[in-house]
């Protein structure tokens, strides 16, 4: 069961990276906000920061690891996001494994390791949907392989 839970997390991570990798550079700056809201890059940075917040909250190993953070309001580059996502995905995996070894209990997240993974996957799915809608409404075309491939977890 542990390996299935870790694999579920890693598939979710690969979906987010697949979306990032498919975006044109100008798409990272797309936004629907007229009042300074997050562009696509900032939405992705937010996803990374939430991963880190929970990874550091639930694991002393992660708190001591000096994981890479973005400044509030920063709109990172693709390369910065790719590097950051690799680190935060590993941090979450560390929390999963440590929680599993502790009968599913995690410091700082009272519901335990399985609800933590569910929360993170739901959070990232929400933001991926928001990003796809932003891209569609700002005229950025996404190919069918990306639009439908994000849902084919058997191939990711």
What are these regions (language model features)?
Residues 56-96:
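Helix-adjacent hinge/juxtasegments
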Residues 20, 51, 89-96, 128:
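A structural signal for well-ordered alpha-helices, especially hydrophobic packing surfaces
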Residues 1-6, 75-82, 118:
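Active-site rim elements
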Residues 6-10, 14-17, 27-69, 106-156:
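Short, contiguous alpha-helical
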């Amino acid at each position: 069961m542990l390996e299935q839970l870790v694999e579920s997390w890693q598939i979710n991570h690969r979906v987010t990276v697949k979306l990032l990798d498919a975006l044109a550079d100008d798409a990272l700056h797309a936004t629907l906000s007229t009042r300074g809201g997050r562009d696509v890059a900032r939405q992705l940075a937010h996803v990374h920061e939430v991963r880190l917040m929970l990874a550091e909250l639930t694991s002393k190993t992660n708190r001591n690891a000096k994981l890479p953070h973005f400044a509030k309001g920063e709109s990172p580059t693709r390369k910065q996001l790719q590097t950051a996502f690799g680190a935060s995905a590993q941090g979450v995996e560390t929390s999963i494994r440590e929680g599993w070894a502790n009968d599913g209990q995690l410091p700082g997240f009272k519901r335990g390791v399985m609800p933590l993974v569910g929360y993170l996957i739901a959070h990232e799915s929400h933001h991926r949907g928001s990003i796809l809608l932003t891209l569609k409404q700002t005229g950025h075309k996404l190919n069918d392989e990306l639009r439908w491939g994000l849902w084919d977890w058997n191939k990711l």
